Amino acid sequence: DLRMSRGLGDVYKRQVIIGTPEEIEKYGKGYDISGATIVDPFNDPNKQKYIDKFVELRSKKGVTPEMAKEQMEKDYMYYACLMCKCGDADGAVSGACHSTGNTIRPALQLLKTKPGISSVSGFFLMEVPDCEFGENGLFVFADCAVSPDYDSEKLAEVAKLSSDSFKSFVGKDAKVAMLSFSSYGSAKHDRVTMVADAVKIAKEKYPDITVDGELQLDAALVPEVAALKAPESPVAGKANTLVFPNLEAGNIGYKLVQRLAKAGAYGPVLQGLSMPVNDLSRGCFADDIVGVVAMTAVQAQNA
């Protein structure tokens, strides 16, 4: 739509816009998108290749060539994912006119998750002004956008993916705090146990990351509190990557920091997929699209 045209006018190099000439002319009028490649899903010479790939990937689910063609013409996100799968694109951005589910579903069906990863999560890169914590105010917050239900195994995966994301985007080593309302067993509850178990799994399964918990937020960030609550922790008092115990906490947490601390909140950026696919809010502005496209490019470069 118009916002996408504006956004891509700013980051036009090597961009692909999927749409009919009529759609592009209608919404792109007045914006310089001359550097972008336009792919018409109804008249693309590569279309049969994508139909064949769709059927190859989904034939066990009963997808026929006719069904694949219809789905690709009806939902351009399927077309984008097939371009990625066939090596004709490095990543995809959607969501300005689609729900999160409609963005993620084609990616899960066609691109799948990374080897060893069972689910997709979403993080925000947070930039907090005048902040002494994290990496000079830079943090990764996860999961803030995707999965409402977690167990210890999946939470450990979020820790690994978030650690990798922090390294990719910030260029520094991540210190991952697994958050709870308890620090090192100070409270007893099934939810505390789930987080503590996730820490154990993450340490055993992903020895390359620095992760600890369970930690309360103040113990994760503030050195003086960390010295009291978790003095032996390699993360407490210096965390820069915060993994929340569930989606409610993550979504509320990033919005609190965004609104009350006037922080920049860049995302949600999806992690766990085999190729970069990212979601936009339907209330996004052109600048938001530029940011998410840029972050998708970073993910592709580090894939």
Task: Kindly give the residue locations of the regions a language model identified.
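Terminal amphipathic helices with adjacent charged low-complexity linkers/tails
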Residues: 13-44
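N-terminal glycine-rich phosphate/adenylate-binding segment common to multiple enzyme folds
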Residues: 46-117, 250-251
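Active-site rim loops that border cofactor/substrate pockets in soluble metabolic enzymes
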Residues: 55-78, 82-83, 144-145, 181-241
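Short, acidic/small-residue loops that bind anionic groups at enzyme active sites
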Residues: 92-95, 103-130, 210-212, 263-279
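C-terminal functional extensions of proteins
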Residues: 137-140, 146-188, 196-197, 201, ...
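A C-terminal functional module that forms or caps the active site or interfaces directly
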Residues: 236, 240-242, 246-261, 265, ...
